[in-house]
Amino acid sequence: VDSLQHYLQRTYPFCYNNDFQYPHLGGEFLLQHAVGACREETDFMIYLLRTMGIPVASDRYIYSPDAFLGHSWSVFKDTTGSFIPTELLRTGVSREWNNRRRKGKVYREQTIPQKNSGSLFGSKLTDVTTDYYPTNQVVISSLQRKGKEKEGLVGVFSMNGWVPVGKYIWQNNRAVIENIEVGGLIYQPLRMNGNRWIPSGYPFLTDEEGRATSLIPDTIHTETVTLTRKHPLTQYWVDI
């Protein structure tokens, strides 16, 4: 896979373009018209690896507050049974792969519906967050249960509002999230109101140990500040 990727990086002039919304394109079309976004890159890599008999799939996150977009990439199964992520024109092949984007949750696309996918985005997406981050359990201690509510959603910040990326469930009157990216990422509990998502509690920040700190505003002791940037300049953008 590493040799194939290096060959493609030298000979396959893929033109990144996310201005258009394509259906899934065939391998022959992508070979002749090397254009599209990360999904088209991923599809082309999947076509190639499957012709070589290498087990391969597509992983994705729904939305990153760092990059302001969703993203997908290919993962192939190595001889140890582990799935190794790789991106066609961006990264090499490494078990220590890290594209440094905030992900929140990671999902794997399946070709057939899964009965117990555990995903709120449909039966063809399976939650594989633990392939990228250690298993954890985050408790939102400040969240108040509404009636007999069994579960709710958690989202991340976007310029157009909060975007759901996962869910929490109620266990012994505690709101619990299973397996999310922790450390420096702000999440927002959400519920549906009409046709839009609205906050159902205070946003919270997690530390590296998975402890959640709710960001509750102090309405008594106030300060006046000038806001010049709504979102921090992350290391991902600095490196670019």
Please tell me what each predicted stretch does.
Residues N136-R145, V225-R229:
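A short, amphipathic beta-strand motif
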Residues M192-H221:
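Structured interaction patches on ligand/partner-binding surfaces of diverse proteins
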Residues N173-R196:
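Short Pro-Gly-centered beta-turn/loop motif in secreted/extracellular proteins
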Residues M159-A175:
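Short, acidic Ser/Thr/Gly-rich low-complexity loop/linker segments typical of extracellular
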Residues T130-I140, L233-D239:
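Contiguous beta-strand segments within globular domains
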Residues S214-I240:
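Compositionally biased low-complexity segments at domain edges in trafficked proteins
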Residues V1-D2, H6-Y7, N18-E28, Q32-D131:
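Hydrophobic/aromatic-rich core segments of domains that either
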Residues Q144-G161, L233-D239:
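Short, ordered, surface-exposed loop/turn motifs in non-cytosolic proteins
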